[in-house]
């Protein structure tokens, strides 16, 4: 069998040409990577936002501020019944309930603990 040398050498020549061009691209791309701009540098934001200084903020944050009682209320108090007299308190509520003091318990702790049986340890000590 006779092989044509051009056919046999073609892939190696093609590889060497492509390797050389790839190396040229790599070396040129390494130099151009230093000069390339990032996406933010290439396209600047459309709106420039300047933060305001905190000394200019004179408005209280409503949810974090204490509630100031206002003298003029928007709530119509004409429909509110007058407070009841203390003489009308039922007899059951007259008995003072003594507060029950318990030891503090973590909310996630179990209500009761079941007794455990002795289990030998996995590792012999």
UniProtKB/Swiss-Prot annotation:
It is found in: Plastid, Chloroplast. Residues 1-46 form a transit peptide. PANTHER family: (RAPE) HYPOTHETICAL PROTEIN, OS01G0939400 PROTEIN. Keywords: Chloroplast, Plastid, Transit peptide. It comes from the Eukaryota. This is Uncharacterized protein At4g14450, chloroplastic. One of its GO terms (cellular component) is cytoplasm. InterPro entries: At4g14450-like (IPR040381).
């Amino acid at each position: 069998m006779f092989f044509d040398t051009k056919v046999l050498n073609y892939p190696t020549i093609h590889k060497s040409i492509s390797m050389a061009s790839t190396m040229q691209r790599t070396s040129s791309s390494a130099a151009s990577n230093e000069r390339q701009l990032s996406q933010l540098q290439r396209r600047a934001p459309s709106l420039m936002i300047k933060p305001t200084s905190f000394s200019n903020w004179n408005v209280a944050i409503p949810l974090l501020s204490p509630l100031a009682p206002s003298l003029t209320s928007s709530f119509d108090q004409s429909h509110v019944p007058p407070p009841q007299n203390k003489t009308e308190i039922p007899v059951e509520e007259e008995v003072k309930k003594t507060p029950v003091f318990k030891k503090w318990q973590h909310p996630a702790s179990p209500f009761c603990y079941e007794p455990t049986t002795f289990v030998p340890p996995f590792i012999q000590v």
